[in-house]
């Protein structure tokens, strides 16, 4: 074998070695990636089960409070404790329970009371007053209320000041009205006339529950939600009076709606219209769980509703997100 042939043979050996190294590196990288994906999947599954376990504990806690106080729900009960944190083997669970009846149910906007004959349903009047209490001009508040009513009703006929498909299809890109109950509060951003600033102001006061009922629990409304309490009544109840009423509330709240309506600040207003939409007892709660495992965060939001003597899940939303390393 001459020098030229030996050189070619050596070159081929080197090429084969290089190819083997590339393949080995690729296989190692692929194996590491598959291992990481498997580990992440297992972590996510474990986090989900942690959240479901915490959900079961939340339901049991609500059940115990309901048995202890079947006719009242208030902020001195165990469920209302904030900042719950549980340590598990490889992470932490953060849990919060809030009253789903301490907000305005947007899906109740078209509901009417048993004896109500007004042209505009009382919940729609409440929503209009809430918008005004949050700084909206009266005309804009009326337009947004009508737009929401059109969005959740099942017809294509616009109300006075309302908006149906033709209004939204004229936008770019165009879209159609829901013509069904809201699935999430974020749908408000799609309403004609809604902007980001007003939407952010509204968020603490509203919810989109799985049914169309409205029963605002005056025992669990925080003083900083006085705008909603004032909106439940005609304009005679001011924001200042509503806030003072909530601040003066006993730790265990009012024993009945009648006891609440007997407060001096409410004697100057028409309480009969608001009465059907008030409560001192809640049967629906929102439990929010955050499971922290390394850099991963697993979020779950469960709507729990009283079903007989226990609480069951009627809606559950969950997701996973990652936090970048510092």
From Swiss-Prot:
Keyword Ribosomal protein among UniProt keywords: no
Subcellular location as annotated? Cell inner membrane
The record describes the protein's role as: Component of the type II secretion system required for the energy-dependent secretion of extracellular factors such as proteases and toxins from the periplasm. Plays a role in pseudopilus assembly and seems to control its length. Interacts with the pseudopilus tip complex that is critical for the recognition and binding of secretion substrates.
**Encoded by which gene?**
pulK
Modifications made to the protein after synthesis: Cleaved by prepilin peptidase.
Which keywords fit this entry according to its UniProt record?
A: Cell inner membrane, Cell membrane, Membrane, Protein transport, Transmembrane, Transmembrane helix, Transport
Q: What is this protein called?
A: Type II secretion system protein K
Q: Tell me, which GO biological process terms does this entry list?
A: protein secretion
A Pfam family that this protein carries is T2SSK_1st
How is this protein annotated for GO cellular component? Answer: plasma membrane
Q: Give me the residues of the propeptide, which is removed upon maturation.
A: 1-7
Q: What is its main location?
A: membrane
- Looking at the UniProt entry, the stretches that span the membrane are 8-28
Give residue ranges on the Periplasmic side.
Answer: 29-326
